[in-house]
Amino acid sequence: MRAAAHALQQATDFLRGDVAVKGGITTLLKTAHLAEAFRMNFEVHHGGNSLNNVANLHVIMAIRNTEFFEVLLPDSAQKYGLVEDIAVGRDGLV
């Protein structure tokens, strides 16, 4: 796991990932907990589509060491698969 090597070598200030790249919710949670063990934030980047972003948001709500949810703009190309899509409000909150 490259994330562990980066954390051990203090080669980064935070770790990142998403459900599609890290191999699902369980692996994403494990990587977030690894970051927490090294007193780092784990930031979740855009999942590439609406369904992945729902899974990403579930992880974000389950961990303490995160500060933001990345949204790619313009977002129309990544919005599909949900009846009611995720919307970011004027206040920046989901």
Stretches with model-predicted labels:
Residues 1-94:
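Shared catalytic-loop signature of beta/alpha-barrel
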